[in-house]
Amino acid sequence: AGVIIGLGGSAGHSHKGHPGDSSGDMYRLATAQNFSAVTGACLMVKKSLYDALGGLDEANFAVAYNDVDFCLRLRAQGYVNVMTPFAAGTHYESKSRGPDTAGGERQARYEAERARFRQKYAPMLAEGGDPYYNPHFTLLYENYGYK
């Protein structure tokens, strides 16, 4: 599904943990809609556009946030990121590489990438985060709960 900027202090997945047959909160998983970003696990973009933007910024975001950064750079060029319910897939977050919060070098890399993301997008985060996310919903949890 889509990615919400500001969720958890940086960015997080909408509807994380919802069953595959769920229509989501307010039927959002069953409706095509714009998001500031979508997960790189199921990201489709023209190769020419990908190349024109320089692809994923692996120098600053080797593992985490590279997809979100790319989508935000797309938005800055006037494009939109659309989540469609008409393509289905299951995203097993970090299944192959393990969690970023497991400690050690992996967690240090994640924290550094998170800090770079927060610094690069500080103005957007300071303005309340995602323009596609209702400001009456919390940014603390991935559950569309009210503030």
Label every PLM stretch briefly.
Residues 7-35, 39, 44, 81, ...:
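C-terminal, non-catalytic tails of nucleotide-sugar-dependent glycosyltransferases
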Residues 1-10, 60:
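Conserved donor NDP-sugar-binding/catalytic core segment of glycosyltransferases
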Residues 92-95:
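Conserved active-site-proximal loop/helix segments of enzymes involved in bacterial cell-wall
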Residues 29-54, 59-88:
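A short, conserved alpha-helix in the catalytic core of glycosyltransferases
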